[in-house]
C-alpha cells in the first residue's frame, strides 16, 4: 500500500510543481475534452496504462520536447536510463530500485532535473513553488521546523549526536500550537524557539543534497502538508516525539546486541564442546549400530549445510541487490568455494613437504614390517567403517598397528626358531624379488621390500622409527643371532621375513611400518585393482599440526558464519548454528578417531579438539563485529554459503555416496538429507515468527517488508 501511495505522491508533487493537475490531464489526453465526472477515471487510466507513442503526432511530441514540457512516456525520443530488472522483491523496503514502479522512476528523474542529486537551494525552490513557505530555510523564523531539519530526519544520521543538541530546544517548546483560519488559508502559530542565528544542528546542516530515495521519503510529508493547508509548518514537538521513538528503538537495538553476543557464544560453545563427545562414544565405536548412526549424521549434515546455504545465507546476501550486485554476491560464493579448495590442498602440500624434509634427515631403518590394510577398498568400503578416513582428517587412513602397544615388540620376534631362521626356511630377499612365496600377496610384499632396500626407491616409503626396550633379556639373546635386516608381513595372517647376513647390534631395534593398500574401482560391470605402499604418519607432532591447521580453519569459518548470522537477526543465527552443529558432530568424531588411532592418548586428543575450538570464538567475534554493517554482512553471507556448499558436497557427500550397497543404507541417507533440508526450510519460512518470539527490534520491520 505504501508503494502505491508513493507512486501517486510523486505524480501529484510534480503536478503541483509544474502545472495544475487539470491542465496536466488535458495535455496527456490530447484534444479530448475532460469533463468533471470522468476526470478521475481518466487520470487513473493514464497512470496505470502505458499509452502508445503513436497516440500523439510526431510534430506535437517534438514541440513538447523542445519546450521542456514533455510529461508523456515518449521513450522513442528520450528513453529512460534505467532498464527493467529481471529480479524483484529482494528489498526490505519500498525505496529499492527493483521495487520502484517505472512511472515513479520516470517522474523522479524529471523532478531531479536529470541530475542524480538535488541541492538545498533546489529543494527550497520546490517548497516555495508548493506554497510550503514555512518549510523553506530561514522562512520559519523559529516558529516551525525548517526544511533542513526535516531532511536530517529522513537521511541516515547519528541519532544520539543530534538528539544531544536538540533536546534542550525541544524542552522549551510547548504543545499549544493553534490553527488560525482566514477564509481559504490556514496558519499554525507555535511558540518561538530561541533565535541564535545558528542552525540547531550546525551550519553545515543547511547545505545538503537529496537523492531520489530521500525525495521518496519526503513525499508523504509534503503531500500531508499540502492536504492540511498549513503552509508547511511542522510543530517541533512532533520531531521531539519522533526523536524519543528513535531513541527507544536504538535502546532496543543495544539490548538485542547483548542477546546476540549471548546466543552466539552459547551456540559456538555448544558446537565446540562436541570434541568431548568423542570420549563418550569410545565404548560404542565397535557397535554394529555405530556405522549406521554415523551415516545418518553425515547425511543430516549434508542436508542442513546445503539447506542453510541455499535457503538462508544466499537469499540474505542477495536481498536488496540490483542485477550487478547479485552477480558480485554470486562471485563471492564461488570465491568461498575456491578459497576452501586452495586452503585444503595447501595444507596437504605443506604436510607432504614436512614429511619429505623429515625423511631426508632420518636414517634408513634396519627392520621393516609390511602389512596389508584390512580397511582397504577391496576388503571394506562402508563409510561407517571408514569414518576416520574422511577428508576432514589430517591423514586419510587409520593406522591400527601404531596403537597396539602390546604387539609393537612382538612382531619383531621371528616366529621360527633360530635354527629354522638360519637354515633358510624363510625366503630370502632375492626370492622375494623373484616373486617366490608361499602365500598370496608375496609379490606385493616383495615390491615393498625392494623399495625399502634399493636406494633408488627410498622416496616410496616413509619411515617411522620406534625404539623399543624389551623387558625379557633372555628373549632378546635368543634373537641376538638373527639378521638385523628383516622384513615381516602379516598378509593374510602369514609371516614373511628376509634375512641379511650383516649384523648390527645397535640398529636391531630400528624398524619401519609399511602398509600395503589395494584400491579397486568398479564401473560398467568390471573392476580394476591396483596396490601401492602407504606409510603411517611420521610423528605425532605432524598429526597434531595438521589437525590444528585443518580443523582450525573449519572452526574459524564456522564461527564467523554464526556471528554474522546472529548479527543480522537471531532467528537466522540459530539456523546457521544448527547447520554447523550437525556438521561438527561427525566432523569432531572423525578427528577424535584419527588422533586416537595415531597413538594419542584420550586426554591429548580432547586437548587438541578443544584447542581448535578456540578459533570458533575468534571467528564469532569477527562475524559479529563486521556483521553490524549490512553491506559487509551480505558479503560474509555469500562467502559463508560457498564454504558450506564446498564442505557439504566435496568433503561430506563422498562419505555417503561410497556406501549405498543396501536399500536400508540408501533410505537412511535419504532420510538424513531430507531431515536436514526440512529443518532449514521451516526455519527459513517462519524466520519472521521466530524473530518475534525472540523479541528482536527488527521483527516488526522485517515482517512489514515481507
Curated annotation (Swiss-Prot):
InterPro entries: ZIP, ZIP_Transporter. Changing residue 554 to A: Severely reduced zinc transport activity in yeast assay. It comes from the Eukaryota. Residues 22-261, 314-329, 626-631, 687-706 are extracellular. Keywords: Cell membrane, Developmental protein, Differentiation, Glycoprotein, Ion transport, Membrane, Neurogenesis, Phosphoprotein, Signal, Transmembrane, Transmembrane helix, Transport, Zinc, Zinc transport. Residues 40-101 are annotated as: Disordered. It is a multi-pass membrane protein. The chain crosses the membrane at residues 262-282, 293-313, 330-350, 605-625, 632-652, 666-686. It holds the Pfam family Zip. Residues 1-21 form the signal peptide. It is found in: Cell membrane. GO terms for biological process: branch fusion, open tracheal system; cell differentiation; cell migration; central nervous system development; germ cell migration; gonad development; gonad morphogenesis; gonadal mesoderm development. GO terms for molecular function: monoatomic cation:bicarbonate symporter activity; zinc ion transmembrane transporter activity. GO terms for cellular component: basolateral plasma membrane; cell surface; plasma membrane. The modification Phosphoserine is found at residues 376-377, 381. Glycans are attached at residues 74, 119, 176, 182, 196, 207. Glycosylated. Residues 40-56 have a biased composition (Polar residues). The keyword Glycoprotein applies. PANTHER family: SOLUTE CARRIER FAMILY 39 (PTHR12191), ZINC TRANSPORTER FOI (PTHR12191:SF37). Required for the normal migration of longitudinal and peripheral glial cells. During larval development, required for the migration of the subretinal glia into the eye disk. During embryonic development, also controls the migration of muscle cells toward their attachment sites. Required in the mesoderm for the correct morphogenesis of embryonic gonad and for tracheal branch fusion during tracheal development. Shg may be cooperating with foi to mediate a common mechanism for gonad and tracheal morphogenesis. Acts as a zinc transporter in both yeast and mammalian cells. This is Zinc transporter foi. It comes from Drosophila melanogaster (Fruit fly). The lineage of its organism: Eukaryota, Metazoa, Ecdysozoa, Arthropoda, Hexapoda.
